[in-house]
Regions:
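Conserved mid-core segment of classical short-chain dehydrogenase/reductases
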Residues: 66, 89-104, 144-147
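Rossmann-fold scaffold of SDR-type NAD(P)-dependent oxidoreductases
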Residues: 11, 79-87, 110, 132
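Residue(s) in the substrate-gating loop at a strand-loop-helix junction
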Residues: 135
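Conserved glycine-rich cofactor-binding loop
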Residues: 7, 12-16
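The beta1-alpha1 cofactor-binding region of Rossmann-like NAD(H)/NADP(H)-dependent oxidoreductases
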Residues: 56-68
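Catalytic Tyr-X3-Lys loop
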Residues: 88, 99-116, 131, 155
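Active-site helix of classical SDR
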Residues: 118, 151
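C-terminal helical subdomain
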Residues: 175, 183, 187-229
Length: 241
């Protein structure tokens, strides 16, 4: 992926990893659009990053996802990078009364949203790069967040297939695999002792400069590579031709 002179859309870009990525991409001389549900968060992001373009939308609504694509296709048809970053994580137990409602919300946000956006944004003639933000929990589930872990395992698997499916179109598919970081994902204060997002961003941008397509940090470097000497040749044989 070239690191400058792109036009980039980052979903969930008003906070956490998304906002940090937006800041770094802007520093690298890119035009960045962020979308999010809360106007207040978008306004705060705009105050921090005056050049960022903001778009309010509720990505859990199919109509809003389609409207976002239509707006980009009309107003920013030269957009060439999609970053599927939006996600939700909730602690839950299978015996909880609200388990299914929480699980449904995570499935919608973490699976349906990036699937639909990827399908639609592939129609943009300028699109040449997709970054999918998964998680180290895609490889080793954390039982406090069982559905989140499963959705990220799905998204990791889909990303592998997507990379092969769009190879002939010269579209690069990059997987961003964060560990727990000092953000409010899952709840305020849960990750106060985790590494800062800034360290993660520095690491993955160094890997982007090296041309890597799986961007890892800390323990995710280990878990994402476990068993790859067995997996990769089987994956290649299964999907050749």
């Amino acid at each position: 992926m070239k690191l400058t002179n792109n036009k980039i859309l980052i979903t969930g870009g008003a906070s956490g990893i998304g906002l940090a990525m937006a800041e770094r991409f802007i520093q690298e001389n890119n035009t960045v659009i962020i979308c999010g549900r809360r106007d207040s968060a978008l306004e705060e992001a705009k105050e921090k990053l005056p050049s960022v373009i903001t778009k309010q939308c509720d990505l859990t609504l199919e109509a809003d996802r389609s409207a976002l694509f239509e707006w980009v296709a009309k107003e920013h048809s030269d957009l060439n990078v999609l970053v599927n970053n939006a996600g939700v994580q909730q602690w839950m137990n299978i015996s909880d009364d609200d388990f299914f409602s929480k699980a449904s919300q995570e499935i919608k946000t973490n699976i349906e949203v990036p699937l639909q956006l990827t399908w639609q944004f592939l129609k943009l003639p300028a699109l040449d790069t997709i970054l999918n933000v998964t998680s180290g929990l895609a490889f080793v589930p954390f039982t406090k967040v069982p559905v989140y872990s499963a959705t990220k395992a799905f998204f990791h698997s889909f990303t592998l297939s997507l990379r092969e499916l769009v190879k002939s179109k010269n579209i690069e598919v990059i997987e961003v695999i964060p560990p727990a970081l000092n953000t409010d994902l899952g709840g305020i204060g849960l990750h106060d002792h985790a590494p800062p997002v800034s360290d993660f961003i520095s690491a993955i941008f160094a890997q982007l400069e090296e041309g890597k397509v799986e961007l890892t940090f800390g323990f995710t470097e280990t878990v994402s590579q476990a068993g790859q000497e067995v997996f990769k040749p089987i994956f290649s044989r299964l999907n050749q031709g």
